[in-house]
Amino acid sequence: MNIASVIVDIPTQALDTPYSYAVPDEMLVGEGGRPAAVGCAVLVTLGGRKAVGYIVGLEEVVPSPDEGADLWGTPQSAADLKQVEAVLSAPFFDEEGAACALWLAERYAAPLSECARLFTPPRAVPRIVRGRDGRWRVEEPAIGEVDDRWVTRGPAFDAFVPRKNAVKQQEVLAAVGAGDVRVAELSREFGAVGSTLKALGAKGAVTVERRRRMRGMEDGASRAGAPAGGPAAPAPTAAPQLTEGQQAAVAAIEAARAAGDGRVVLVDGVTGSGKTEVYLQAIERTLAEGRRAIVLVPEISLTPQTVARFRGRFGDAVAVMHSRMSDGERYDQWDFIKSGAAKVVVGARSALFTPAANVGLIVIDEEHEGSYKQDSSPRYRARDVAEWMMARAGGALVLGSATPSIEALYQVNKNPRWTAAALPERANGRPMPAIEVVDMAAEFASGSRAMFSGRLARALGEELAQGRKAVLLLNQRGFAKFLLCRDCGFVPECPHCSTSLTYHEQGAKLVCHHCGYTVAAPPTCPECGSPYLKKFGAGTQRVETELRQLLDGLPGVGPTVPIIRMDADTTQAKGAHQELLESFAAADAAVLLGTQMIAKGLDFDDVTLVGVINADTQLHLPDYRAGERTFQLIEQVAGRAGRAELDGRVMVQTYEADDVAIRAAATYNRGMFLRAELPKRKLLGYPPYVRMANVLLWGADEHAVATEAELLHAQLAELIRNEVGERWQVLPAVPCVLAKLRNTYRYHIVVKAPLGDDLSAPLVRLFRARKVNPAVNAAVDIDPVDLL
């Protein structure tokens, strides 16, 4: 008998293990449909209802006459096993993907079905729905392949001569003679061509055939897998000569790959040091051995420039995956990867779960970025998943950053499986730009109330007047524009979240950036009726307005210098990100104004000035990483200046000029920052000296959430005390910093454990055994990146 181990697609901790189902022999060979295999979606029955499941194990079992055993060693009568009722899809993943899904569930205390779903393309899995008659039925996937009709030369193309008055036939034949062409393109050019193609087809002059269309190619999302006659990637370029530091970094990666046991190499290189070229050459060596590579880039840095570097080297062998692509585009790229034609996958963190077989190298660029941690279940950290994958596959993991996370630096120091390759200088030999700290408190004391200091204004005038470019960063994290009544102190807040509403100049409206709640800005204070509602803070729209006024008054600059604003509003439309960068590149002198999305991943030779308008706002967040993130942001954005032959300079405006994070970043002195930061982390018990878990609870009834939080805290404290004693800390249940979000109240419990301890196992056991309160949601975040 053949038995399948199936993860049932119902997201609950109660389904904490795969279930065993008998597989009819005809399903194994695919009689009448697809064969059953690991990774397939299947139809099963669980508890009287139909459900979709994923096969994660398949084994032939010979039971004794009275009793058999399932894959997990549980004695079970073979006659009691339910059968797999239908195979609903081809395999989405292989045995390694199945093993990873099971590991993710244990590591991150997540429902098995949510972990398995990571490996499926968006909206490509059949669903089970219940009809009005009460019967369950399978609803086909919403996403699948799409075809285009193409016209090619027929067997009689050369011999056929159309009549002189058959103008449309002549036009169509001329177009086809230049190469295969889509019917849709012929229709756009010549109008309705259906009857013309039918007539030409009857004569054997042309052939009309269906070909799969790879969505997204026409707008540059990825041209990989383009059909004949479609747009092709540029021819691969040759690798440049490496610097000594780059050669040493590539050698370190090669040594890690040769070890074949999942070693980690941290490429610790300043901005402009050529880290990307190191990745490219390490990938070339990996591909030469017949293996594949995955490159992770933060979503915010996944710019057309970044993709072009990889496609310029590897051409049509590059697949791209990111959230700005449509579901159809991602489905096509997923399928392209599964076909084996894609040798390199470039994408955000979810690219880890694409069906790329035989991966020998994973690169995580900007490894310090918080976006590599998923903020919904399963709350995985991409670095840890990639390290697990490479240990299993006998490959190597490469982490790259100009400002590595403190945890990565600690691992290099303490873990013999981790090594570092330093690139302390820029690849072109140019110096790092000088950073000047502008004390805005002193500016204010001298009577200045302007958003731009005198020194930054003068620097803008000097650089722009010479036809050069500037980048201005508005650090909006923890700093947004709001209204405040100067009479009573009232600040309009979101009725659904415990945050102030952000004021938007365009449309004079107040918006909650957590839940999207929007309301017109009141003309007077809703609390006391005062007309003195003052705008505090500065959004990018207001900064753009004041910057325009400043530039218009600068000698030699004036209104002809464009300001290109990049933020969440201006980059919403598809392709807007690329269009804005192209506009900036094409201008003679221009200012790129934006939020953190401009701090990294941009490489323009003629940017000579970088200004940070408000460097210290992140320091005031109740987050133990606040200083680290401020240090990283300043060094990252500073690296946008002076990347080519022209010298660069950086102006950092701050009200906290004496803060060690800002002073250290301004002098590129990581050691200064670490000497101040690490003792605080050790004293207070924060990473890298401990591991943490954040147990989250949320619900619509605040009293119910608080009560459940106290109960769960007591259960946790007892479990930890009994299993590990006093070495772990279970902090009291308290409201989150963001105590209310989208009409739900939020509490959390922080658990701290020594390094090396299995933090997940006790929490997984508790969560799978506890009685669920239907009024309160609960989840575990293992190794959280923040506690907000």
Predicted regions located by residue number:
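Inter-lobe coupling/hinge segments of SF2-like helicase ATPases
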Residues: 233-243, 247-251, 261-706, 718, ...
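Solvent-exposed beta-strand/loop surfaces of large extracellular or lumenal domains
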Residues: 729-737, 783
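C-terminal effector/interaction modules appended to NTPase cores
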Residues: 742-744
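Accessory, non-ATPase domains that flank or precede helicase/AAA+ motor cores in DNA-metabolism machines
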Residues: 1-401, 408-409, 413-430, 464-465, ...
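Short intrinsically disordered coil segments
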Residues: 21, 437-438, 451-456, 712, ...
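Short amphipathic alpha-helix segments
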Residues: 670, 706-731
